[in-house]
Amino acid sequence: VSGPVLVLGLGVTGRAVLEALSTRGLDVLAVDDRPGPEARSCAERLSVELVDSPNPTSWTGLVERAGEVVVSPGIPDGHPVFAAAAAAGVQILDESDLADRWDARPRCAVTGTNGKTTVVTLVADMLQRSGLVAVPAGNTDTPLVAAIDDVDADVFVVEASSFRLGHAAAFSASPAVWLNFAPDHLDVHADLAVYEEAKARIWEGVASPGDAVANLADPVVAARAPSGATGFGTPDAACHIRSGILILEGSPVVEVSDMARSMPHDLENAQAACVVAMRAGANLEACAESLRHFSGLEHRMSFVAEVAGVRYVDDSKATTPHATLTAMSSLPGAVLIVGGRNKGLDLAGLANGRPRAVVAIGEAAEPMAAAFEGSCHVVMASSMEEAVMLASEAAAGTGVVLLSPGCSSFDWYGSYVERGRDFQRIVLSLAGDGSP
């Protein structure tokens, strides 16, 4: 490749890519539209030239200097780098393409609008319990280019977001599962069709048709599933629930009553994880043990406390209306705290979740309130404290208060984790002394 590798976007992944390229002695050029202190210090430490993002018309000149362009997740589809690269005949890559080039160890992958991190965590645990060193990577805290530095790893379990799949030159992981599909990230993708197309690339590099794993209960995923795919989620699929037992290809794995989590979405995640883990080298008993012990991840339908007869549930990770509808179907009649920064998604169907009452928060408070208008009691709150107080009043006695925002957190918080922790802090202060 003639010319330096241009790395666009110096978030967690971009910085890991810089590090990986530099330590391998490759010539690198870094660009960030809004470089923060971490980006600057990373470039400085590695002696990499950090170029200010040019105006849209000057991108071609910059890209022509490069041999390849590695694009960080979250760079929107309409970014001028894509047109410039196409015009200059320069290849766009995702970090997974670099990992492919440098490391030949097996990897399996998980994509879907909801449930990715949960299934990655389950698969890694099932493989670990089977005696393999399984390392979660990708959309997690550890980019794949950093994870491959772990010489002890036997297998990588990759969380593959639509951003990563869309940018990859050739995505390769086997087995690979697509969990579900619902509108999301329309602030990044040009439209829904582009988002669906990106997700469908998860199966591009499977070693055999059966390594394409599909949720047949999801109409979009089922319609996209290649011939010979391994299915789950429907009564006649390879993996299904029958008479209260999770069954994989005719073998009973675990009784649902023994599972630590068994809401409807938990059962779909469990089936997906079993299929992927078994095809990646796990054994059935390890899968069963994992499901008996896995109590879920923080901020995903996590029980916080019960105060004065009201249960509080933190589902801050729900950043799409689809995720919030899933949460409401698991907790019918809950008082819902909902809102934040909407990612260009349609809120119209949310009222179908039929909450007892709604407290709308954040930038999207007004459109959220409008979405539920007429279906239940709706109020708006201007802080999380106020939201919890209002929700507690509405749930008084025997109810459930569910924080499931259906939006990103970036209006009031730095992340969904920060938002969830704030909610937990407020709830626990109610539990502690009865006052906020």
Regions found by a protein language model. Give the residues of each.
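N-terminal leader/targeting and accessory segments in enzymes
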Residues: V1-D94, L98, L430-D433
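C-terminal helical cap/extension that packs against the catalytic core
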Residues: P37-L50, L345-V400, S435-P436
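Short internal beta-strands
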Residues: D27-D33, A212-L216, I337-G339, R354-A364
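Beta-strand->loop->alpha-helix junctions that form or flank phosphate-binding loops
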Residues: D32, D52-P54, L93-D97, V135-G138, ...
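Residue-level signal for inorganic ion chemistry
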Residues: L21, V69, V110, N139, ...
